[in-house]
């Protein structure tokens, strides 16, 4: 679906790479839905009489029109105005028998699995302006969870190994386990996935001992869930280079991409070219934007910038992979729901916000979440940091803060020396906390500290105190391939907290958290 638009990012020159060998057995043998194939072929003839499909006739739909009342986007901060009830509104109408961006007779009928053209073209235009992907196409999904599970089926066979961050969103990685896919964790730090560890895993892989070499990397590059880290441009380039060298498909799951903080957009660009161009200059470069091989499958979602219940997102990939995803959708979930597509068509259409209006909303939304992040950090510094029991990285994007609990200062923290199996709190402790990979290499069989036990006790303490955060163990990818140099249990001294709640929730929650830490560490 080529779209000629102006972009702040130069279009890279694609190179022809055959990636068909990455397809799963299911994807290779899947045949197009034969009825859908006939229906698609018929679309080339305008006004054709449809006597083939079993479509309920639009005159019998019990609906004639819908109105969507949305913010008008007047003023510099529309999200603040909408939140406080001072915003003017804009009424978007979608009709069955009157002119609309997307007629309800079309939206509510059976459609193509890839989605209706009005929505796909609007999203392709937006993607071209922000990412400038070479020779890529867009198809719709029912949100990123749907898109990701379809990608697992597209690329994964039983006993395949996929790569991911060592702490990641377990609800999604668990979906792959049911397909017989095994996860290989890659180390992370405050800046996200470490390209040198990715390269080490691939370089040292022994197919005789470990099975087939991993050929897919699943990553959340912006506000990685749960760590909140964002991968820098330099790291992205190095990761893509490793992917090219070792022939890895990159699934770029980026639902928090538009929630970037501390951005300084160019006011001259904003005045001359609008929000989309101004935002494209300061948003992080995606893996998609540098994909000259066609090995990136990017997943975007409206869940974080509009509402999660909309259950609509979009997948950007090479036409080859898009065609395979289309066949999978036509034989499974079918087309995305018409109500959501009608809403998006009007919102992004000529009488609605358009792409530029969406970017204005996104910029304003990020400012509001940035305010809440700053409040979280301020309260954390005032209440939690003075205890000395925990610290936190300030996230650049997204909704999460990754809190490190300093268990090394807990009176019951112990380290089992690898040679004797005894407990020792001496010099070994310093070695574990400073460089867990060095000591952990001796103890690949399992954790050498009681981190998991203490974190479990802390979680119970938090619940009893009236606050809940998600422990790192929930997101930990246990290495069963033998690639990891140190047990992840010894690095699971973290909690994931969110700052998307109300100001009162943030203040009260962190106050309780600080008190619970003091009691847990026997400081009170």
From Swiss-Prot:
Gene3D superfamilies: Type I PLP-dependent aspartate aminotransferase-like (Major domain). Optimum temperature is 37 degrees Celsius. It comes from the Eukaryota. One of its GO terms (biological process) is alpha-amino acid metabolic process. One of its GO terms (molecular function) is pyridoxal phosphate binding. Atromentin has been shown to induce caspase-3 and poly (ADP-ribose) polymerase (PARP) in human leukemia U937 cells. It also has anticoagulant activity. Moreover, atromentin has antimicrobial activity. It acts especially as an inhibitor of FabK, the enoyl-acyl carrier protein (ACP) reductase of S.pneumoniae. Its EC number is 2.6.1.5. Its cofactor is pyridoxal 5'-phosphate. Keywords: Aminotransferase, Pyridoxal phosphate, Transferase. InterPro entries: Aminotransferase_I/II_large (IPR004839), Class-I_PLP-dep_aminotransf (IPR050859), PyrdxlP-dep_Trfase (IPR015424), PyrdxlP-dep_Trfase_major (IPR015421). Pathway: Secondary metabolite biosynthesis. It catalyses: L-tyrosine + 2-oxoglutarate = 3-(4-hydroxyphenyl)pyruvate + L-glutamate. Optimum pH is 9.0. It is an enzyme of class 2 (transferase). Belongs to the class-I pyridoxal-phosphate-dependent aminotransferase family. PANTHER family: AMINOTRANSFERASE (PTHR42790), AROMATIC AMINO ACID AMINOTRANSFERASE, HYPOTHETICAL (EUROFUNG) (PTHR42790:SF1). This is L-tyrosine:2-oxoglutarate aminotransferase atrD. It comes from Tapinella panuoides.
């Amino acid at each position: 679906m080529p779209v000629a638009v102006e972009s702040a990012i130069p279009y890279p020159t694609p190179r022809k790479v055959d990636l068909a060998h990455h397809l799963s057995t299911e994807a290779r043998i899947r045949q197009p839905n034969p009825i859908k194939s006939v229906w698609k072929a018929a679309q080339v003839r305008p006004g054709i009489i449809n006597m083939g499909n079993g479509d309920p006739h639009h005159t019998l739909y019990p609906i004639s029109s819908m109105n969507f009342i949305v913010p008008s986007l007047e003023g510099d901060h529309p999200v603040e105005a909408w939140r406080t009830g001072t915003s003017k509104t804009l009424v978007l109408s979608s009709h069955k028998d009157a002119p609309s961006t997307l007629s309800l007779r079309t939206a509510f009928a059976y459609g193509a699995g890839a989605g209706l053209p009005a929505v796909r073209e609007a999203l392709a235009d937006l993607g071209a302006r922000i990412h400038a992907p070479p020779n890529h196409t867009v198809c719709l999904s029912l949100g990123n969870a749907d898109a990701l599970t379809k990608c697992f089926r597209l690329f994964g066979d039983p006993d395949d190994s996929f790569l991911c961050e060592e702490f990641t969103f377990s609800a999604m990685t668990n979906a792959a386990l049911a397909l017989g896919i095994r996860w290989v964790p890659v180390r992370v730090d405050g800046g996200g996935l470490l390209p040198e560890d990715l390269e080490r895993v691939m370089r040292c892989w022994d197919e005789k001992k470990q099975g087939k070499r991993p050929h897919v990397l699943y990553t959340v590059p912006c506000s990685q869930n749960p760590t909140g880290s964002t991968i820098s441009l330099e790291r992205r380039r190095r990761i893509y280079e490793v992917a090219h060298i070792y022939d890895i498909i990159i699934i770029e799951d980026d639902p928090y991409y538009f929630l970037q903080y501390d951005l300084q957009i160019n006011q001259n660009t904003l005045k001359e070219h609008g929000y989309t161009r101004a935002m494209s200059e300061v948003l992080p470069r995606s893996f998609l934007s540098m994909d000259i091989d066609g090995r990136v499958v990017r997943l975007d979602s409206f869940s974080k910038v509009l509402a999660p219940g909309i259950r609509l997102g979009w997948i950007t990939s090479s036409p080859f992979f898009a065609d395979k995803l289309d066949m999978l959708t036509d034989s499974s979930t079918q087309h995305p729901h018409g109500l959501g597509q009608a809403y998006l068509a009007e919102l992004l259409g000529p009488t609605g916000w358009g792409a530029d209006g969406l970017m204005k909303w996104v910029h304003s939304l990020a400012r509001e979440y940035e305010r809440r992040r700053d409040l979280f950090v301020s309260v954390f510094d005032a209440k939690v940091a003075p205890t000395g029991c925990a610290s936190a990285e300030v996230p650049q994007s997204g909704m999460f803060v990754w809190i490190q609990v300093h268990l090394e200062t807990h009176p019951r923290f112990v380290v089992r020396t690898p040679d004797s199996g005894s407990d020792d709190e001496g010099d070994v402790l310093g070695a574990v906390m400073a460089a867990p990979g060095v000591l952990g290499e001796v103890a690949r069989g399992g954790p050498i500290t009681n981190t998991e036990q203490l974190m479990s006790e802390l979680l119970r303490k938090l619940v009893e105190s009236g606050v809940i955060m998600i422990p790192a163990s929930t997101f930990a990818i246990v290495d069963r391939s033998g690639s990891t140099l140190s047990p992840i249990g010894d690095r699971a001294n973290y909690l994931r907290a969110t700052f998307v709640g109300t100001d009162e929730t943030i203040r009260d929650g962190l106050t309780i958290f600080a008190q619970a830490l003091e009691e847990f560490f026997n400081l009170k």
